[in-house]
C-alpha cells in the first residue's frame, strides 16, 4: 500500500486524513498549527514539521489549503514539497485554486521530477467526515488510476474531468451553481415570509418538486432556524467566486448571475458575516426586503 501524506489539516483536511488512516494507508501529516495534527497521532499518523519531510515519507501527497499562493509555497517554497520530492512522488492538490495556476504548477513540478493532479472536492465538512466527497480530477490518466484507491477512501463520486486544470475548472462551475442556488433558496423563503404563508410547509413542498435543490433540502431548514454555523465559510465561498470571475474575464464571458451573487456575498462580508456559513446569504435578502424568514 502506498504511503500517503497530508499537508493542511483544516475543516476538510483533518477528516480526510483520518479516512485515509481508516482505509489502512500509512499517513504522515503536517500543519502550521501543530495541535491540529495531534488527534491523528493516536490513530496511527506520523506528524512531522515541514512539507519537505512529508514529501520524503510519502508516495501520494495531498495538499488541502486555501489559495493558489498557498499551494505554490507548499510545493516550491523553503522546506516545501519540491525539496523532499523523490522519483515517483505524486502531489495531489485537493484545494480549490485557479485552473491557470494549476497548469503552471504542474509544469514546474514535472521539471522538478515529480507529478501532480488537481482534485478539488465538493461535499463540505460533512462529506469529508463521511468519506462521501465528490472529487473532480485533472491530470494524466495513468496518475489518476494510481491515486484511485486513495480517492475511494475519501469520496463516493470520483470523476476524471480532463487534463491539468480541468478538475479546478469543474469545481468553479460547481461553485457558481452552489452560490446561485443559495440565492434562489434565500429569495424563495423571504418571498414566502413576506406573503405570510407557512414557511415549513412551503419548504417541504418546494423541496418535493421541480424547485428542489441540494440547498433547498440541506440549507433551507438551517436558514429558517437561524443556524448559520459554517460548513463552508462565506470568506471561502467568495475566494472561489473570485476565481470563477477571473476565469470568466479571461474568456470574455458574461455571467450576470455570478456577478450578482458575488456582490451580495460582498455585502454579507462587509456586515461581518465572512466567517458564517455560505447559507447566511439569506440575511442579505432579508435586509433588502425588510422581512425575516424564521420559524417561530
Pin down the residues of each PLM region.
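Interdomain hinge/lid region at the active-site interface
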Residues: 164, 168, 212-280, 296
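Active-site-proximal catalytic alpha-helix in oxidoreductases
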Residues: 130-138, 159, 163-195, 206-218, ...
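Rossmann-fold dinucleotide-binding core
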Residues: 4, 97-175, 179
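Hydrophobic beta-strand scaffold residues
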Residues: 27, 47, 116-117, 158, ...
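Rossmann-like NAD(P)(H) cofactor-binding subdomain of soluble oxidoreductases
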Residues: 51-56, 60, 68-133
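NAD(P)+-binding Rossmann beta1-loop-alpha1 motif at the extreme N-terminus of oxidoreductases
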Residues: 1-63, 89, 94, 125
